Structure formats: structure tokens, C-alpha cells
């Protein structure tokens, strides 16, 4: 028994070292911009850079729009499949998995061919149109995470009973979804939203090919032209991502644990 515990701790130490040592090395390097000693100058340079503020703010705005549009699509669809058409669930799950199967570069080239200046809907002709195209591309990219989060939330409540009770009280379908179903799955919705937001903020391929100056593109440009600031940006991105994961874990503590009644 003691030998098993010893080996377990050895494996844990090796695994932890595999992840922690590169992170610690990156942190150390980001603090060595001055040879005289450790300093936060690299982080100060990043936060003071107007391009950081612009690209991060733009990525955050696009991310929030992505979450809103994604919820407007996913929540009603998942609710309908759960309540009225459970036979469609395998098809919906397959469709939502396609963004994980199809490479992002293939996806964005398809968008460019469909919505270029010679198409019926030339979104790439204007900044607003390209930003809209980027948002919908991110909605597709976030579908696997958003749909599964919402579907998991719907599994924890009795959708049939709640819908029947709300209908008896005179609620229409929009009121049922917005005032009854949505508040009961808010924790799952927020989990999917934080995960989608974390993915969108760091995305590079789609935004780069659409010529959008987002945070991921800014990180690549800084990495190509500076030494210590890229390390600082990596740590900032790491903190943002794990902050989102921490929020998901925290919100998960408040999720309902009871299974729906049959």
C-alpha cells in the first residue's frame, strides 16, 4: 500500500513538474528585462501599450457579442430538442462538434469565399461587416462548449414539468424560456459563457485571416518583435484563462445536483 502511494506521488510530481517548470521559467524570464534584478517593467510596458488596450478591449467586445448571439441560438435550440424532439439530439450534437473537426483555417476560408466583395452578401467590404462575420465565426467556434454547457444544465431540471406549469399560468414560449428555463440553468449558461469568452479572446487564425486586430494577433506581433513582453503576455493570458476556469469551477458549486424526474 505504501509503495503504491509512493509511486502515485512520484507520478504526480513528474506531471506537476511538466506543467509548472515551463510556467515558472516564463515568469522568471518576464521579470528579467533589467539585468540588475527582477522587475515588472515588461508587464508595465504591455499595459501601457495603446495597442494592448485597443486589441484586448475589441476582443472582449467581440467575445461578449459572441456569447450573446450564441445563447440566443443555443438555449432555444437545446430547449426544443430536450422537450419536443429528443430524436434530433444525436444530429444536433454532431453539428455542434463540427467546429472541432473542421480546422479553423478551413472555416475562415469558407467564410471569405461566401462573403467576399463579389458575393450576394459582401460582409468583408466594411469594418462593421467583417466584425460581424468574425463574431458569427466565433459563435460557430464556441458551439461545442456552449451547447454542452446548456444541455448539461437542462438535464438537471425537469423541463417538461416547468414548461407545463408555466403554460398553465398563461406564459407563452418566449416567457417560458426567458423567465422559467433560463434562470434555472444560469450557472450552466455562465460556465459556457466564460469558457467561450476565454477561447475567443486568445483566438488568432480566424481574426488574422480576416485582418482583424484582436488580442491574439497583438500577441503574435509582440512575440515577433520583442523579447520580454511576449513572456509577460503569456502569463497575462494564462491568468485570464485560468481565471475563467476558476469562475466555472466556482459557479459549478451552485449548480443543481438533482436529476430530472421521469
Residues covered by each model-derived region:
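The alpha-helix within a helix-turn-helix
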Residues: 166
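Left-handed beta-helix
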Residues: 153-163
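Short hydrophobic, aromatic-rich alpha-helical segments embedded in or entering the lipid bilayer
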Residues: 35-48, 210-222
